[in-house]
Swiss-Prot record:
Top-rank taxon: Eukaryota
Ligand binding (ATP): 30-38, 53
Class of enzymatic activity (EC top level): transferase
Cystine residue pairs: none
Membership in a protein family: Belongs to the protein kinase superfamily. CAMK Ser/Thr protein kinase family.
Chain positions covered by the region annotation Calmodulin-binding (domain-N): 306-330
Signal peptide residues on this chain, from the entry's feature table: none
Designated name of the protein: Phosphorylase b kinase gamma catalytic chain, liver/testis isoform
Length: 406
């Protein structure tokens, strides 16, 4: 998807990025970050397409302290990406260049874009599709943790899709190495995906800190969001949303959960454990029944004639199943008037019509607020204190601050 170009998106001149331009030809903009622009680029020698993340690190836009922070964070990201290179579900760093004013990171081109955009288009995903995505994500997280790396910013915007709808985990700007027994105290990430221990750590100087478990909490939030189309923790006042996170307050009450299995709800509940010690690890999550495949018995030794007969009966049975599934069930007027959204075919019709009419998702229940997906602040470091947290109408009151601390 090509994005509009603004004045701040102008390409670096040849002199400032000669080494990059000699090898790659930058094209249209396909994404933007807080301090970067992502463009499609073409390798001049081979014609292969890639994605290049361009970050301006000039004194004109950043202070000396900010410049050093950006450079250090980018170098740390590059080091981690090289360490985890080769994993099928982690983005591959192809090339990197650094000049006095710009830094360039060249990655694989993921043509399907962000999982966030895909979810916005689909509204909610099926359990089958969610199972495939979450298995790949947990495998990537397990690999990171095995290498003593914590990501700290897992969310649909940082999960990319290739042509085959396979995921790649990206944006390792907040990632860091974490040795056994070591704890972190830095507050970073996106509010809706922050684990309770991160918030508590920022409010209590005596808190021991947090570890790799924060990534599994974020996985639980992502799993919930993919199936419901809206996040588990949301309130129009951010201070109350943070309290919901710290207390683990979420519900399976929206209409989408009527069709979801108890197995996936159980997995979500074990990932969204407020106590990090009780939370599943990535390896344990992958062993959950939600990811189990039905293993058949030993293959039969059939003659060619027997195999042919089995194939014929299978085709006939599949045809009957397909035919019966397309037959409309009787629909009474009273049932339609009483609760049209409870009927799955009508529900999909309502969703599709609403999306085409308004161009965005439409709220259908009191517990739903898909707008929360679009209201998350960019990843950043932000202190949480009574004098600094804000709601939708200004600074929070002392009573609200007490709610969070309690």
């Amino acid at each position: 998807m090509t994005l509009d170009v603004g004045p701040e998106d102008e390409l670096p001149d040849w002199a400032a990025a000669k080494e990059f331009y000699q090898k790659y030809d930058p094209k249209d903009i396909i994404g933007r970050g807080v301090s970067s622009v992502v463009r499609r680029c073409v390798h001049r020698a081979t014609g292969d397409e890639f994605a290049v993340k361009i970050m301006e690190v000039s004194a004109e836009r950043l202070s000396l302290e900010q410049l050093e922070e950006v450079r250090d964070a980018t170098r740390r990201e590059m080091h981690i990406l090289r360490q985890v290179a080769g994993h099928p579900h982690i983005i591959t760093l192809i090339d990197s260049y650094e000049s006095s004013s710009f830094m360039f990171l060249v990655f694989d081109l993921m043509r399907k874009g962000e999982l966030f955009d895909y979810l916005t288009e689909k509204v909610a995903l099926s359990e089958k599709e969610t199972r495939s995505i979450m298995r790949s994500l947990l495998e990537a997280v397990s690999f990171l943790h095995a290498n003593n790396i914590v990501h700290r910013d897992l969310k649909p915007e940082n999960i990319l899709l290739d042509d085959n709808m396979q995921i790649r985990l990206s944006d390792f700007g907040f990632s860091c190495h974490l040795e056994a027994g070591e704890k972190l105290r830095e507050l970073c990430g996106t509010p809706g995906y922050l684990a309770p221990e991160i918030l508590k750590c920022s409010m209590d100087e005596t808190h021991p800190g947090y570890g790799k478990e924060v990534d599994l909490w974020a996985c639980g939030v992502i799993l919930f969001t993919l199936l419901a189309g809206s996040p588990p923790f949301w309130h129009r006042r951010q201070i109350l949303m943070l309290r919901m996170i710290m207390e683990g307050q979420y519900q399976f009450t929206s209409p989408e959960w009527d069709d979801r299995s108890n197995t996936v709800k159980d997995l979500i509940s074990k990932l969204l454990q407020v106590d990090p010690e009780a939370r599943l690890t990535a390896e344990q999550a992958l062993q959950h029944p939600f990811f189990e495949r039905c293993e058949g018995s030993q293959p039969w030794n059939l003659t060619p004639r027997q195999r042919f007969r089995v194939a014929v009966w299978t085709i006939l049975a599949a045809g009957r199943v397909a035919l019966s599934s397309h037959r409309l069930r009787p629909l009474t007027k009273n049932a339609l008037l009483r609760d049209p959204y409870a009927l799955r075919p009508v529900r999909r019709l309502i969703d599709n019509c609403a999306f085409r009419l308004y161009g965005h998702w439409v709220k259908k229940g009191e517990q739903q607020n898909r707008a929360a997906l679009f209201q998350h602040q960019p990843p950043r470091l932000f202190p949480i204190a009574a004098t600094e947290l804000e709601g939708d109408s200004g600074a929070i009151t002392e009573d609200e601050a007490t709610l969070v601390r309690s």
